[in-house]
């Protein structure tokens, strides 16, 4: 069975379990156990840590994936890996020193709205360092095509850690201060796990020396770092701008809608863990026919699986919001239902273009990545300003959808022009028809007046309808092969 199918299937399961646990943490455990004030503190500090983390890693985890397969000798490969460990220290050490020397000033600045934040800002630097090195060691695993354990640590472990700490807090075994201490400890324990695992797969010779292509590696890292900034703007700018333009509760409704649609990305996140290094290796070997094959397969399989998830979500959206109302007793969340539809369309557009981002970022045209990223960030900001004013907070979702579809089309066109390859086949039309027809059939179908029963039964019917058509029309040869092998094993 294909290595991609094996690991992608395992990674999808991990991400789905992680998403379920994350949903419980976000919608129920956090608010009811730790309270909204402390919950807000954790969210703010972890968000700030996530902003700093890319500065610390400086895109070197992506450089490992791009350049590791481009060199033949173990000596040169080892130089790249050691560089990825040492280089972040030139950023981490001075920033950490500045942070410590100006601790009170930074604390006062960050705690203007909530004075309690000042007491816990050590979380920002501590977790940023841990996460930066986790990503670097995880990239070591990816280039060896071993992604499942790292994906488990990245997606499921941290959510499980939060759940355990919340219950320790609930049973009064720890207070909030020790909650933060154990949170940091848990992140560093995760780093130790991935470090030992990556070294068990591939152990470099720990001798400090400079790779032959040092300039190219650092230049690539810089460009990826800049593009990461643009990507983070697209992710966070909606909520940030809405916070200035609409009421706080509207922002909360918007964030929950975004959270619901996040699961549509799970197949992409799972697939690209293993696909990125394979695309890099294929490009380094100049194997364009294989690259086109990866391109087409990633497009059709991602569209098929992401389409299935989007049909489940969009067809059951009323029941999903009924569940949210039961947990929170706030019916206002329903006004964000259109956000779910717009963001779902944008995510399906990203699934449709498959591994186009991997192709561009791992090719000699990687210098265009910051252009696409920063241009899309600027465009979404201007569209937000215009559309939020015209149609309210829904305008933020519309602008996101427009920008993602537009720039996916531009990237698709760029790859077609430069590589003479495209990701579509006749199966693409069949899959799109399958997604649209299933949505039309099940969206207005009500089987029971009890929303939980209705939700479960519709999910079952959608699963059997969608999977049966997929199997008998052979829309995914990889998925059919996987099912046949599993059937034979039984």
What is the predicted function of each stretch?
Residues 1-4, 116, 176-182, 192-235, ...:
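Interhelical loop/hinge segments that connect adjacent transmembrane helices in multipass membrane
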Residues 56-72, 143, 257, 261-299, ...:
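Helix-loop junctions and terminal segments of transmembrane helices
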């Amino acid at each position: 069975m294909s290595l991609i199918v094996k690991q992608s299937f395992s990674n999808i399961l991990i991400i789905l379990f992680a998403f379920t646990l994350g949903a419980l943490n976000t919608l129920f455990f956090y608010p009811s156990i730790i309270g909204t004030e402390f919950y807000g503190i954790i969210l703010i500090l972890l968000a700030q840590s996530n902003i700093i983390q890319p500065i610390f890693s400086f895109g070197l985890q992506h450089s490992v994936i791009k350049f590791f397969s481009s060199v033949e000798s173990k000596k040169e490969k080892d130089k790249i890996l050691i560089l990825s460990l040492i280089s972040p220290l030139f950023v981490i050490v001075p920033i950490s020193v500045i942070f410590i020397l100006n601790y009170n000033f930074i604390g006062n600045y960050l705690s203007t709205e909530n004075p309690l934040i000042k007491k816990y800002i050590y979380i920002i630097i501590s977790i940023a360092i841990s996460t930066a090195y986790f990503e670097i060691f995880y990239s070591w695993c990816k280039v060896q095509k071993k992604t499942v354990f790292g994906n488990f640590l990245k997606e499921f472990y941290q959510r499980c850690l939060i759940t355990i700490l919340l219950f320790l807090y609930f049973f009064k075994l720890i207070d909030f201060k020790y909650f933060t201490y154990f949170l940091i400890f848990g992140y560093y324990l995760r780093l130790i796990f991935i470090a030992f695992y990556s070294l068990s797969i591939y152990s470099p010779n720990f001798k400090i020396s400079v790779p032959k292509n040092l300039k190219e590696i650092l230049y690539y890292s810089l460009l990826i770092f800049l593009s990461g900034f643009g990507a983070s703007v697209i992710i966070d700018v909606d909520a940030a701008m809405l916070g200035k333009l609409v009421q706080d509760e509207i922002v909360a409704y918007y964030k929950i809608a975004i959270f619901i649609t996040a699961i549509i990305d799970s197949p992409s996140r799972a697939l690209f863990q293993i696909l990125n290094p394979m695309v890099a290796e294929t490009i380094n070997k100049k194997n364009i026919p294989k690259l086109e094959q990866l391109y087409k397969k990633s497009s059709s399989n991602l569209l098929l699986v992401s389409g299935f998830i989007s049909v489940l979500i969009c067809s059951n959206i009323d029941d999903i919001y009924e569940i949210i109302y039961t947990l929170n007793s706030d019916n206002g969340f329903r006004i964000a239902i259109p956000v779910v539809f717009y963001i779902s369309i944008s995510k399906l557009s990203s699934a449709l273009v498959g591994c186009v981002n991997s192709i561009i970022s791992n090719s000699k045209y990687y210098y265009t990545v910051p252009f696409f990223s920063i241009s899309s960030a600027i465009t979404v900001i201007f569209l937000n300003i215009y559309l939020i004013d015209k149609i309210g907070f829904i305008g933020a979702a519309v602008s996101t959808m427009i920008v993602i579809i537009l720039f996916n089309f531009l990237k698709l066109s760029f790859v077609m022009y430069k590589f003479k390859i495209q990701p579509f086949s006749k199966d693409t039309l069949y899959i799109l028809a399958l997604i649209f027809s299933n949505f039309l059939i099940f969206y207005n179908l009500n089987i029971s007046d009890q929303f939980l029963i209705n939700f479960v039964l519709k999910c079952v019917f959608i699963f059997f309808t969608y999977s049966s058509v997929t199997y008998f029309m052979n829309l995914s040869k990889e998925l059919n092969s996987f099912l046949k092998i599993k059937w034979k094993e039984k």
